[in-house]
From Swiss-Prot:
InterPro entries: Ac_CoA_lig, ACAS_N, AMP-bd_C, AMP-bd_C_sf, AMP-binding_CS, AMP-dep_synth/lig_dom, ANL_N_sf. It comes from the Bacteria. Gene3D superfamilies: 3.30.300.30, N-terminal domain of ligase-like (3.40.50.12780). One of its GO terms (cellular component) is cytosol. PROSITE patterns: AMP_BINDING. The modification N6-acetyllysine is found at residue 617. This is Acetyl-coenzyme A synthetase. The gene is acsA. SUPFAM superfamilies: Acetyl-CoA synthetase-like (SSF56801). Keywords: Acetylation, ATP-binding, Ligase, Magnesium, Metal-binding, Nucleotide-binding. One of its GO terms (molecular function) is AMP binding. Coiled coil: none annotated. It comes from Mycobacterium bovis (strain ATCC BAA-935 / AF2122/97). CoA binds at residues 190-193, 311, 531. It catalyses: acetate + ATP + CoA = acetyl-CoA + AMP + diphosphate.
Length: 651
């Protein structure tokens, strides 16, 4: 097994040149520690306020926060107008790449201002006013960003629904938000083919009695045929295209609602996470500048997330634009028309900062380094990871192969609910450890606690890993302001577990090492109890993926009469690895060696693919059903439900 455990570095300090020119310096930690509220006031004052705030934080009605009290601003003005007024109107705001090869658009900040103003005027003409809700059900096209900013400009809450979601998911979100307008497209491109989108929108609306939606604004994207409801349905290019490009933004209170974003509603009613204007944009702008070290004059930033997810909101729209950065948006899948697509885009636009998910990184690993190696990726100077804990093997591969062994890599931890990144290395300061999100950002306070809310001591060398609960013990500017229409659920979901301490419970397990670095281990639900030992699925998965033949792994705990739970692993092998009769036993032995004999999987199944949601998350719940020979639960959010035929055949 020696080939699976080569001598590798345990930490990676930033290159001297990067550290010398980094936006964030070590003094930030000291400033935030000395006076946290003054620190956040300083960050907020980087925005343009029509009316200055008079109080930084009002926590008198905890857990409902008010940040930058009394201040007024317009989010869209901060993302667009002020850059044009500062003389940067000719700077590219968005390089958009459609999935069909050759389909592209470029919008400067002046172009974006005109388009957002036209859309704002069009929405006003349709009778929308501040406080209304608009549902956006679009592929990742420029109109999606324009629609979001037009809503923000008018004080209207947008509720973006991922274009891969079903009619039922869209219906639930429209009903909960009582949306007055739905913005959609005739269709979208997926894996080289046009597929209908408005048809799902029509199905969703038809299933709603006394539907709140008055109009459906339709973007022509694919040209496919569709049903049309006269009087209700309107073409974007008619309504927005004919509107005036002149519009004066109105300031809104710092706590004015900005958007709703729903977390998965596959079981029960979806949770509408509500974010507001001043606090969200402050932390969004701050984290973009410090974590990603953006230089507006020279950087080209690419966050690969769809705008249907919070990562796409914060680091695909508001973060880059409020900092005046040039960004790339790509509509399609990473393997259309072939597996070179992402690397062609990096090369084409000279992307300097690339932010993606571990799922995609592991997919690239599975495809082999020959693909990225055939492209010039030298423009990249910083890499980022988001969405789930990244295992050390994938971390190193990402840095070595995509980053050429020279770029800093920021592994960011945050949630839909936190609004912005919370735990991450600062790239010009930290000696990053593969697999660790490192430390809370300046201005953020986090703890790892036990069942009683007491802080856990750092892990010591040779001792058993102790998994605790990741909690946030101080309010932060971009925190959610509640669950739409359900304050009791907000308290119960996030604050009830440690109510006596006043901690926000993130739902993730984590541990802290002797250097104070935080290792997020995934959802607490993904912690197994084997003979009284709590073992994280993430730790076992990391041990499996560290083997030279494994591309991806998913681990679940299954019922066992002797040990309470046993570990069952599903692994996808690398394309260039030749399996043999003892592959499964070899992997079981490796896990026992890396973690503990207690962590040795009872079963290892080699499968062709893992079941994933449309957002790329592995559905361990369904793998548990397979492992325990149960009927599959809800598969509505799966990207490809047929994957279970192959998994069962392999098992």
């Amino acid at each position: 097994m020696s080939e699976s455990t080569p001598e590798v570095s345990s930490s990676y300090p930033p290159p001297a040149h990067f550290a010398e020119h980094a936006n964030a310096r070590a003094e930030l930690y000291r400033e935030a520690e000395e006076d946290r509220l003054a620190f956040w006031a300083k960050q907020a004052n980087r925005l343009s306020w029509t009316t200055p705030f008079t109080e930084v934080l009002d926590w008198s009605e905890a857990p409902f926060a008010k940040w930058f009290v009394g201040g007024e601003l317009n989010v869209a003005y901060n993302c667009v107008d002020r850059h044009v007024e500062a003389g940067h109107g000719d700077r590219v705001a968005i390089h958009w790449e459609g999935e069909p090869v050759g389909d592209r658009r470029t919008l400067t900040y002046s172009d974006l201002l005109a388009e957002v103003s036209k859309a704002a005027n069009a929405l006003t003409d349709l009778g929308l006013v501040a406080g209304d809700r608009v549902a956006i059900y679009l592929p990742l096209i420029p109109e999606a960003v324009i629609a979001m900013l037009a809503c923000a400009r008018l004080g209207i809450m947008h509720s973006v629904v991922f274009g891969g979601f079903t009619a039922a998911a869209l219906q639930a979100r429209i009903v909960d938000a009582q949306a007055k307008l739905l913005i959609t497209a005739d269709g979208q491109f997926r894996r080289g083919k046009p597929s209908p989108l408005k048809a799902a929108a029509d199905e969703a609306l038809a299933a709603i009695p006394d539907c709140s939606v008055e109009h459906v604004l339709v973007v022509r994207r694919t040209g496919i045929e569709m049903a049309w409801s006269e009087g209700r349905d309107l073409w974007w290019h008619h309504v927005v295209g004919s509107a005036s490009p002149a519009h004066t933004p109105e300031p809104f209170d710092s706590e004015h609602p900005l958007f709703l974003l729903y977390t998965s509603g596959t079981t029960g009613k979806p949770k509408g996470i509500m974010h507001t204007s001043g606090g969200y944009l402050t932390q969004c702008c701050y984290t973009m500048r410090t974590i990603f070290d953006v230089k507006p004059d020279s950087d080209v930033f690419w966050c690969t997330a769809d705008i249907g997810w919070v990562t796409g909101h914060t680091y695909g729209v508001y973060g880059p634009l409020c900092n005046g950065v040039t960004e790339v948006l790509y509509e399609g899948t990473p393997d259309t028309p072939d597996r070179h697509r992402h690397f062609q885009i990096i090369e084409k636009y000279g992307v300097t900062i690339y932010y993606t998910a571990p799922t995609l990184i592991r997919m690239f690993m599975k495809w082999g380094r020959e693909i990225p190696d055939s492209h010039d990726l030298s423009s990249l100077r910083l890499l980022g990871s988001v969405g789930e804990p990244i295992n050390p093997e994938a971390w190193r591969w990402y840095r070595d192969v995509i980053g050429g062994g020279r770029t800093p890599l920021v592994d960011t931890w945050w949630q839909t609910e936190t609004g912005s990144a919370m735990i991450s290395p600062l790239p010009g300061i930290a000696a990053a450890k593969p697999g660790s999100a490192m430390t809370p950002l300046p201005g953020i306070s986090a703890k790892i606690v036990d069942d009683h809310g007491d802080p856990l001591p750092p892990h010591t060398e040779g001792a058993q890993h102790v998994t605790g609960y990741l909690v946030l013990d101080q309010p932060w500017p971009s925190m959610l302001r509640g669950i739409w229409g359900d304050p009791a659920r907000y308290w119960h979901s996030y604050w009830s577990k440690f109510s006596d301490k006043g901690y926000y419970f993130a739902g993730d397990g984590a541990r802290i090492d002797p250097d104070g670095a935080i290792w997020v281990l995934g959802r607490i639900d993904d912690v197994m109890n084997v003979s009284g030992h709590r073992i994280s699925t993430a730790e076992v998965e990391s041990a499996l993926v560290a083997h030279s033949g494994v591309a991806e792994a998913a681990v679940v705990g299954v019922t066992d009469e002797t040990t309470t739970q046993a570990i069952c692993a599903f692994v996808v092998l690398r394309a260039n690895y030749a399996p043999h009769d003892r592959t499964a036993e070899e992997l079981r032995t490796e896990v026992a060696r890396v973690i503990s004999p207690i962590a040795r999987p009872r079963d290892v199944h080699v499968v062709p693919e893992l079941p994933k949601t449309r957002s790329g998350k592995i559905m361990r719940r369904l793998l548990r059903d397979v492992a325990e020979n149960r009927e599959l639960g809800d598969t509505s959010t799966l990207l490809d439900p047929t994957v279970f035929d192959a998994i069962r055949a392999a098992k």
